[in-house]
Amino acid sequence: MTDLHIVEASIAELRRALEAGTVTSVELVGACLRRIAHYDRHGIALNAVPLLNPKMFEEAGASDWRRRNGAALGPLDGIPYTAKDSYKVSGMTVAAGSPAFEHLIANEDAFTIGRLRAGGAVLI
């Protein structure tokens, strides 16, 4: 991977790096997970990302395949993002931090999540 600092990089910078082939979406997802692990799971243990998308690497790999084949879905294709756990993501819990809702599973995506997914963005 390049010397790109993903935490400080803008979406435009990440997109340019993806388009240039200096980084892949899979690598960006891995870098995000390392950053999350550093602050969320160890050290000061923020627990800011309580739920991870189990399909993130599959989605990132699909984005990389589309990019290699000239079929990117748009400027957000391959860009990792997070969403508050109160947003509905099909197949994932919508607990909003409440133990009372920890088993509530979304059966559809919220509008914003659906738009991001349609554009190829990768939910962490």
Model-derived features: positions:
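Conserved hydrophobic/aromatic pocket- or pore-lining residues that grip, position, or stack substrates
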Residues: 32, 56, 78, 84, ...
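An N-terminal boundary/leader segment
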Residues: 1-59, 69
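Enzymes and membrane/adaptor proteins characterized by extended Gly/Ser/Thr/Asp/Glu-rich
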Residues: 11, 38-43, 62, 67, ...
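Loop/turn elements at helix/coil->beta-strand transitions in domains of secreted/extracellular proteins
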Residues: 24-26, 45, 72, 79, ...
